[in-house]
Amino acid sequence: MTAEKTPATPDCGLLPTVERQTGESPQCAIIWLHGLGADGHDFEPIVDEFDFDQLPAIRFVFPHAPMRAVTINGGYVMRAWYDIVSADFAPGREESEGVRESASKIESLLARENARGIPDSRIVLAGFSQGGVVALHTGLRHSRRLAGILALSCYLPMTDTLSTEAQPANRDVPIFMAHGQADAVIPYELGKRSAKLLKALNYPVQWQGYATEHSVCLEELHDVESWLTRVLADAC
């Protein structure tokens, strides 16, 4: 598969993004959110690792998170989807205002894909670490059916509001969650509990653990490719 590069988009009011296309006139899209301190280029190379030749052309959209001070890092300003005030992942300790603010920005990117001819039903919302947290939060509360949610090395935030905020359109959306068993940043068991909670709410979650740390390994990428191929083939 040869993926075409397109420049970062400067659309007024939208997050800047890096884009890759697997062909002309994309019919599907994957909006992929990076982790804390990274940027939209972080996962750009994985496009060349995937083999989607049997699928219609896909547009990969890698947004850059806003710059903000991160409390747990001494107030250092970096790209972050929300502030992290402590390493305590107890329910209710997330910086909910920042999560919601980022979710609103991702909603705007979803709307732009709609305007470019790709309906929500052909869009996968994906993310790693902080990006996965925002992908889960946004996708489960999105009012129109998505093709899927891909959440790597992360956890489900704001569980206390999910029952009242979850949208019926995505109650059966395919979800792939994966986590490194030696993750020292976001505990493996936290990710596993998040998947278990979603399964208890009857979301169709595929959960995978891997012998890696806070990163994505080759075996995981192969499983992600298989899952994406399946959900996008069903959607497109």
PLM feature segments, named:
Residues 63-64, 126, 150-153, 178, ...:
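Alpha/beta-hydrolase-fold catalytic nucleophile elbow
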Residues 4-121:
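Serine-hydrolase catalytic machinery in alpha/beta-hydrolase-like enzymes
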Residues 189-236:
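C-terminal catalytic histidine-bearing segment of alpha/beta-hydrolase fold enzymes
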Residues 119-170:
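Primarily recognizes the serine-hydrolase "nucleophile elbow" in alpha/beta-hydrolase
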Residues 170-175, 201-203:
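Short, proline-enriched alpha-helix->beta-strand connector loops that line the catalytic pocket
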Residues 34-36, 123-128, 180:
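Conserved alpha/beta-hydrolase "nucleophile elbow" surrounding the catalytic nucleophile
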Residues 176-179, 183:
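Short beta-strand/loop motif that positions the catalytic acidic residue
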Residues 43-48, 163, 187-197:
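Short alpha-helix in the alpha/beta-hydrolase fold that links the catalytic acid
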